[in-house]
Amino acid sequence: MPIRPATCRRGAARLSSMKASIPTPPLAPPPAVGGAATQVSLIPVLRDNYVFVLHGPGPGPAVVVDPAVAEPVITWLEERGLELVAILHTHHHSDHIGGTPELLRRWPEAEVIASGADLERIPLQTRSVAGGDRFTLLGRSVDVLAVPGHTRHHIAYSLPAWGPTRTAGAEGPEPAGPTAAGELFCGDTLFAGGCGRLFEGTPEQMHASLRQFAALPEDTRVWCAHEYTATNLAWAASVEPADPAIGTRLEAVREARAAGHPTIPSRIGLELRTNLFLRAADPAALAVLRSSRNDWKG
């Protein structure tokens, strides 16, 4: 389905109040994951946010996903000779769009792609999309998924695999060379070991949204926007203490965090085995789990 153009022009001043007020930590060199054609890198910002960058192996165009803040993103791109050509937004929360006005001041020709249904809350759009749309960025097909639950008009971006993928269920570091699974930029709908709070949606909506993710190839890399994995899995282990997959993953995650490493990306297959929300049989079961997670103090 073709992308529908937005009905408004940019007005950077309209979002100036949305800029994140939390001080940005020093820029850390983020790890890159990908192959020869397109890579994904993550930039840690704020307390636990990740900004994602879709780019090639050298200087050239880049796409940024959910920029909470701008300064570390600008620095990261400029240090690598990358030119911002597009910004993808999954939803309207300020820790996902707060950096957009400043990024546009630096790269005024960059496109802003977001849900057309959220035009009032994400007013800088130059391309408005909806679930079922498909477009191309940096030579990759991008499928738009409507995934309400966390917010009314939350969307996700699924990029199908562009090369041979690794064996389903395989663990360990991502392989080097021309091997690339699909990518899922899911915002705050799916987290590693968890899911987003239901601020505007219902358990029925969230369950249906997670079912869309569960249907993706198991090797699909999951790029969720917050580092919540250790807490999510500690809660899951308290709910299912005899589940060996959850316990094993929790131990590995704690080791990774102690060493200063991110736990993102995850993979759909790993989430199917260890994420209680993705395993929920129906909306009622998900609602019980969400209530338990909300109340859990660790």
What function would you assign to each model-found segment?
Residues 54, 66, 91, 103, ...:
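Divalent metal-coordination and catalytic microenvironments
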Residues 19-27, 167, 211-221, 228-298:
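Accessory terminal helices/loops
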Residues 194-220:
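Active-site-adjacent loop/tail segments of enzyme domains
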Residues 4, 8-82, 102, 107, ...:
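Zn-dependent metallo-beta-lactamase
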Residues 47, 62, 69-146, 160-172, ...:
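Active-site HxH/HxHxD metal-binding segment of metal-dependent hydrolases
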Residues 54-55, 158-160, 236-237:
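Short beta-strand-to-turn element immediately C-terminal to the catalytic PLP-Schiff-base lysine
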Residues 1-18, 158, 173-175, 186:
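Intrinsically disordered, low-complexity proline-rich regions
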Residues 67-69, 92, 117-118, 150-151, ...:
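Active-site metal-binding loops of divalent metal-dependent hydrolases
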